Amino acid sequence: MFGKLLPCAILVWCLFSLGQARQEETVEECERNIPASLKGRVCELRQYTPVQGKDMDSHMQCVLEVLGFVEDNGELVFQELLGVLKMVDPDGDHASSMKKCNAEAEKVDTSSKANTFYTCFLGTSSAQAFKYAVDYVELLRAGKLDMGTTFNAGQVSALMKQIDDGLCN
């Protein structure tokens, strides 16, 4: 059991360390500071609806950066995201999806990299694992789950439903 908790704790600590460069520290803060053109679409965006444009580029940079999945220049933090994806879905071939989408993101301007990666990744076989990974780390960073909490799909889904219902109903 200790052998499973230690890598999880180390990964979560790394994710928290990476997300410290921004003013925002949680997805909630990114949503609070969302560009005006997206303010009325927060509920839609929380359901993983890809949106194009500079405002969404900025928002996804914020979200993925506070989660520790991209650097402040939009570059993918490959091992961090892969580690969470493997916790969520140990059997998935997430690395190939990540490589494909990272290659797409490398073709665009720095300001669009995070959103390009996000949009691409939602079209891969790893999309569900990615959604769970984002939700799981969002809950950890927001203090809704304790740092040592191992991934549980039912628990993550229930907590995200509570948050979404509170915001969107």
Swiss-Prot record:
One Pfam entry name: PBP_GOBP
InterPro entries the UniProt entry points to: PBP/GOBP, PBP_GOBP_sf
GO BP annotations, alphabetical order: vasodilation
Amino acids binding noradrenaline: 31, 46, 135, 138
Protein name in UniProt: Short form salivary protein D7R3
Source organism (scientific name): Anopheles gambiae (African malaria mosquito)
Subcellular localization(s) per the UniProt record: Secreted
Disulfide bonds: 30-62, 43-168, 101-120
Residues making up the signal peptide according to the UniProt record: 1-21
Family stated for the protein in its record: Belongs to the PBP/GOBP family.
Positions annotated to bind serotonin: 31, 59, 118, 135, 138
Binding site for histamine: 118, 135, 138
One GO location term (cellular component): extracellular space
Source taxon at top rank: Eukaryota
Free-text function comment from the UniProt entry: Modulates blood feeding of female mosquitoes on vertebrate species by binding and sequestering different mediators involved in the host response. Binds serotonin, noradrenaline, histamine and adrenaline. Inhibits histamine-, serotonin- and noradrenaline-induced smooth muscle contraction. Exhibits vasodilating activity.
Keywords: Disulfide bond, Secreted, Signal, Vasoactive, Vasodilator
An annotated Gene Ontology molecular function: odorant binding
Tissue-specificity statement: Female saliva (at protein level). Female salivary gland. Low-level expression in female carcass without salivary glands. Not detected in male tissues.
